Structure formats: structure tokens, C-alpha cells
Amino acid sequence: MNIHEYQGKDILKKFGVSVPRGIVAFSPDEAKQAAQQLFEEQGSPVVVVKAQIHAGGRGKAGGVKLAKSPDEAMEIARQMLGATLVTHQTGPEGKQVSRLLVEEGMNIDREFYVGITLDRSTSRNVLMVSTEGGMEIEKVAEETPDKLLKIQVDPLYGLQGFQAREAAFFLGLEGEQFRNAVTFIIALYNAYMTIDASLAEINPLVVTKEGRVLALDAKINFDGNALFRHKNFLELRDTNEEDPFEVEASKSNLNYVRLDGNVGCMVNGAGLAMATMDMIQLAGGRPANFLDVGGGASPETVEEGFKIILSDKNVRAILVNIFGGIVRCDRVAGGIIQAARKIGLNLPVIVRLEGTNAEIAQKMLDESGLNLIAANGLHDAAAKVNQALAAG
């Protein structure tokens, strides 16, 4: 689960991570009041007005601007709120701005990158620091790997002081700046672990000319599987920033990711779902979604899955690919029949069922009187999907 920058900073601040003073605003008047308060309290010559969306690249897209007065902050807010911000991460459709973060300006000396995430290749958390602050870390790793330091963290011992010092030394910091950076990195790691985050990224981490070390931007992603331990964080979810189909699917405990193809997929199991999408692509089609109905698929979840798939107007055919291990194929078949009759499926539906009660399921489909295309194996299913698309 992703959250906004200002929400992430509020959480990090509780763990001792230094962040600039900021106030969230939902209207131009609130932005003016926030700026006035910051000018009076902080004595900064400028404030920064930042669009709050779940995407990076806001600065280049005009979503981060300086204001030298409360009135200027209000005018910037008028322009930003309700506008659609298009960045390299939003796609061409962009994201609408509904809230702003008004923040004190910083007297920046240097910018760095600090991030913590899980390295799945080693099954360990990894601390990453770079001297190239403000840039995409993937680009830095590819083009200038010598400017990126990765430190593997032993899960039994956690981040050690010498590792935090190694990171600060790599950034070329000395004296008070060095000590502040070490404190910052340790606090960030403690926050990352305590809140069960999957990513804690500070880009940029800034060092001011006064020696302060602060998170100028913060991106926090939560591990969705651990949210049951942090139910208060669920209140931070902004569904307006998410795909509406994915939000609807989550209500039925369906794992759904929308893609830009024309073949709807309904599968049980993430591995089988990815293999199914690969086969569709190889056969000449394009998957329209990733939809995993899970191991406990019921007629109701299958019906809900069809509704979500059909809400995508780009879908021209549907492939149901179920391997009945935990789930019984006859229950899935019942859901397909129920959905077809209730919703009125008017698209080609190719069905491949293997495993527990597959014969019973196939008989149910054959006797349903519905126009469902049976497939024998994954290759055959993908081929029949392509034939259905070609036919029209």
C-alpha cells in the first residue's frame, strides 16, 4: 500500500527522522494560511508548494514550486489543485491533484539518496545510498554503479552502527554532518522495520549549509501482508490514487492488476497467472489484466471476477485457466455458469480446468447450454483465444 509524501513524513518524524516543517492543504485558502504560519514560525524566505500524488517526477512536471509570500502560495495552489499532473510514472492519463504539502524552504548544500528495501535475491533488507540525490536510483545503478553503495543487513542483528557510518562515509560527509547522517540512517531503518514497510526511500536526502540532515522527499510503501498488524495505517489509504478496478477487486479479496491488452484472464495462483499471460502474448494476444482468484475460489468470487474483467471495455475475449488443487474445479464451473447467466456474457470465454473434479466441471459446462469454449491444456487455450480474437 502506498501513501502520500506528507503522510510518510508524519510517520518518520515519530521515529526521530528529521523532516522539514510542513502543513497539508486541501484548498487555496488553506495553502495561504499554511504559508503564513511557516513564514512566521520558521523565518524561511520561501516555502515550497508540492502536489501530493502517488508518483515520482513531480518537480519536472510542474508539481513542485517555490512561493515567496502567502498570496503567491495561494495562487500556486489555485493552479495545482484540480489539475492533472503527468509524470514519467503516471502514464499519459496523469493523476489529479487533490491536496498539497506546503513546506519550509531549505538552504540546501548537497543532495543524496537513501533507501531501504528487501533484496529478494538474498532474502535480506538492503540499505542503499548514493551521491546522486534527486535522480532515479535505477538509472544511477545502471549508468554509474560506482556512485551507489548497497549494504546487506543481517536479519538477526539488524542495521549496525558501523554500517550506518560506512554509508555516511561513502557520501563524503564529515563532522556534524557525518554524525547527523548516521543518526538519520539508523532512525530510518528503525522506522522501516517497525512499520513493516516494503520500501522507505528518501530522495533527496539533503544536507543544509547549517549542517542539518533532512528528508526533503519521502516515499513509504507498506507490506500489504503485514497491514493486519497496523490497522491504523489503513486510514491513510487514498483510493483516488489507485485504479478503480483494482480497488473494487480488493473488496472481494481478488488480486487484480489492470494492463492494456484485450484478453481478460482469470486464474488461480500468481505463478499460473504469469504463465498464462506469457502464453497469451506468445499466441498473438495481449493480456488485459492479472487476476488471481486465489486458492479458495467460490462461485461468488468467480462471478465478481467476471464483473471486474467485463468493466474493462478493451476486453474482447476471456480466458479462465484453473488448476484445481485446493480449489475444486466444479465450484469454479458453477461460478462461471452463474456469472454467464446473471451477467449475460457476450464475449468468447475459453475455459481450461485441470485437477480436482475437472471431469465433473467439464460436464457441468457442457450441459449448461452456454457458449463456452473448452480447452485441453495451456497451449490449446492460448491458441483458441487467438482464434476467437481473429474471428472477431
Swiss-Prot record:
Cofactor remark from the record: Binds 1 Mg(2+) ion per subunit.
Q: Where is the signal peptide?
A: none
Question: What GO CC terms are in its UniProt record?
Answer: cytosol; succinate-CoA ligase complex
Write down the chemical reaction(s) this protein catalyses.
Answer: succinate + ATP + CoA = succinyl-CoA + ADP + phosphate; GTP + succinate + CoA = succinyl-CoA + GDP + phosphate
Write out the function statement from the record: Succinyl-CoA synthetase functions in the citric acid cycle (TCA), coupling the hydrolysis of succinyl-CoA to the synthesis of either ATP or GTP and thus represents the only step of substrate-level phosphorylation in the TCA. The beta subunit provides nucleotide specificity of the enzyme and binds the substrate succinate, while the binding sites for coenzyme A and phosphate are found in the alpha subunit.
* Entry's family note: Belongs to the succinate/malate CoA ligase beta subunit family.
Please give the name of this protein: Succinate--CoA ligase [ADP-forming] subunit beta
What species is this protein from? Chlorobium limicola (strain DSM 245 / NBRC 103803 / 6330)
The record's gene field reads: sucC
